[in-house]
Amino acid sequence: MALWGGRFTQAADQRFKQFNDSLRFDYRLAEQDIVGSVAWSKALVTVGVLTAEEQVQLEEALNVLLEDVRARPQQILESDAEDIHSWVEGKLIDKVGQLGKKLHTGRSRNDQVATDLKLWCKDTVSELLTANRQLQSALVETAENNQDAVMPGYTHLQRAQPVTFAHWCLAYVEMLARDESRLQDALKRLDVSPLGCGALAGTAYEIDREQLAGWLGFASATRNSLDSVSDRDHVLELLSAAAIGMVHLSRFAEDLIFFNTGEAGFVELSDRVTSGSSLMPQKKNPDALELIRGKCGRVQGALTGMMMTLKGLPLAYNKDMQEDKEGLFDALDTWLDCLHMAALVLDGIQVKRPRCQEAAQQGYANATELADYLVAKGVPFREAHHIVGEAVVEAIRQGKPLEELPLSELQKFSQVIGEDVYPILSLQSCLDKRAAKGGVSPQQVAQAIAFAQARLG
């Protein structure tokens, strides 16, 4: 059934109807639409539109419909209703007859859909927060199990300084913690109810909107009706959080894809998250990680698309706003799926410690330690930097690591170098010296793990 029509003398062209209808995607708001309708029926009692008995009859019918939708959601898509609001109202009228036609009194689809979408967003943010924290916990557990797995850290994809696999895991815990904070922050601004704002100017019925907001679980009601039906900031904020979160997951995926290559060989992924080749029998492809990396683009696109949709819209509601849902649904679904998949990748990952250690010992990753050693001997850092650069060139020429150059060779570059330099150049010394907060020393990594465990509970 259509919720409008008296003004028109011709039926809508079928092609326009298909173009205009939104049920194929806003069916996902069915539960929220029904819950919002129950609350609205209670509000209508307070202003004398419904009797208490009528409200009970409507609420009972709506609750039956809610259970029916939860049991068989696919039934919605069997309808040719224009949108989810039309579908719910049509089903309600089928159940209670003329009484169902009173429910929309004082309400517009403009404030109705804004309310539905905010309720959906609140539910989805809760799911995202749970999945985010589960991935953080998986990373912390992996870190705890790999505190002694020394590996090269990279800048410019060149070996730079030794780190540990645990320290690498904890870097992504920090990123995910910021993602968690962004979601929680967005939820604060999202948690206001637009229901009762009507089409744009507010409702003509003296409904207590704060009470109505409380019935729906919102912290408060919105303050301006024009803004309330026009506002899609919460969509932009969640898309932005998703875009940033997916960038973090994409970087996580790219790191592990590289670590998993034959050239690096730092990790081996579980068979449960890899696939083979139809031609090459030896292949074990990191498809789960590649898909996480690939799906990042569609989420960035959803954010950009929504920004462009909103940028030129006048107040208040415009049909353009119907375009807010598909991108949002897809982006948050994608983010949620990727959070779950990233946790699955960590479940069963094998860190190849000997290969990690071997790589950490290559590439002159201890060169900075030699420079710091010279500084401790009174050599200005800039001069020490130059001296070590020359020493590295000589070590490369001889095909040796720095620690295998004899003292006589090292002293050609600086006479302050003594026998005490060799312990300084060990991998363990490189790690131990990074003992400032946030560093890679075993003590700092252990503290970071303990802090994350306490925060995650």
From Swiss-Prot:
It catalyses: 2-(N(omega)-L-arginino)succinate = fumarate + L-arginine. Pathway: Amino-acid biosynthesis; L-arginine biosynthesis; L-arginine from L-ornithine and carbamoyl phosphate: step 3/3. GO terms for cellular component: cytosol. SUPFAM superfamilies: L-aspartase-like. It is found in: Cytoplasm. InterPro entries: Arg_succ_lyase_C, Argininosuccinate_lyase, Fumarase/histidase_N, Fumarate_lyase_CS, Fumarate_lyase_fam, Fumarate_lyase_N, L-Aspartase-like. GO terms for molecular function: argininosuccinate lyase activity. GO terms for biological process: arginine biosynthetic process via ornithine; L-arginine biosynthetic process. It comes from the Bacteria. Its EC number is 4.3.2.1. Keywords: Amino-acid biosynthesis, Arginine biosynthesis, Cytoplasm, Lyase. Belongs to the lyase 1 family. Argininosuccinate lyase subfamily. This is Argininosuccinate lyase. The gene is argH.
